[in-house]
Amino acid sequence: MAFFKKLKEKLFKSSSKLDEGLDAIIEDGGVEETIEAPDVPLDDENAKAILPEPEPEPEPEPEPEPEPEPEPEPEPEPEPEPEPEPEPEPEPEPEIAAQTPAPKAGLLDRLLGRGETKTVVRRELDDDMLEQLEELLIQSDMGVDTALRVTANMAEGRFGKRMSAQEIKQLLTEEVARIMEPVAKPMPLYATKPQVVLVVGVNGSGKTTTIGKLASQFKAAGKSVVIAAGDTFRAAAVEQLQVWGDRAGVPVLTAPEGSDPASLAFDAMTKAQADGADLLMIDTAGRLQNRQDLMEELAKIVRVIRKKDPDAPHNTLLVLDATTGQNALSQVETFKKLADVSGLIMTKLDGTAKGGVLVALADKFGLPIHAIGVGEQIDDLAPFDPEDFAKALTGLE
């Protein structure tokens, strides 16, 4: 629940854009309607709040015990007559209130829920409204195909009906959650030791930070982890992993800058096996400007670690930057060809107004989404929850 609150706060760019856009669509051509509360009798609990409580019956007083007869007292001397008390002055009459309060609803009306009305703007779900919805979803980076499919599903059985902004948001939330539900899967953990996790992604996607967060979380869960800083051409990536490793108490294997990443992966695999580590996480380069070199590099890493374990890597995670929008789709296409991608992690959802790209990815590729990130802290990376994400995206309360 804490992460959902954080997600909702940090997805304010996307949610406010969709939220305000949906409100504007309903306002444009909508008509204000008066809603009267239904005549439904209140339940016992609410009726008690309205009805006066009956006064409790007084308990019978206990009979007094017989008192002993008093001894005869001597006759007192006669007292002087008291002086007459002065007559009290008459109290001034209270002033009449200047305004008479508005009459409250009668008890019967209150019991039946009458007397309370409110207004709501509703608009007919027609072709014009659907077109506006499609444009809004495309602007949020859901993509044309996904936006058309979502609006078509929203209109099914509801075309021609009058709908409020809240009802449209509820519908959109349900449709987004329906698309995301099948892909919301945590990263699988296996009995194999070490479980090799190959992490790929373009430079700047948050790949290195994600490895550090995952390693820290696995270590906190009682797993032993080894990290291989396989992006040997970027000194900053190696240093960043070393910082995360020191913070989490996870060993980080490094190699001289520009050295062979496959050789480092082999050494890391040897150490992880010798130590009986649960997980080996291997960072990789992300230089998409030279795809041929990258493809050969990744293929070599896989060949080398398979000499140690024919089933490795057991997971290949693609880390994506949400701020790249529709470019994330082309990155998935590319890395699916370069490596056998088994799952996605989406980072930087706190910095984009186009969180709908995650819906497009789920709709187009159907790859498992293991986690999403909304910040720099360790707990800002959390398992993907489709309902929480859908509510945060649409701004639904």
Language model segments and positions:
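Non-catalytic terminal/linker segments enriched in charged/polar, low-complexity residues
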Residues: 1-175, 185, 220
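P-loop/Walker A NTP-binding module and the surrounding RecA-like catalytic core of P-loop NTPases
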Residues: 145, 173-397
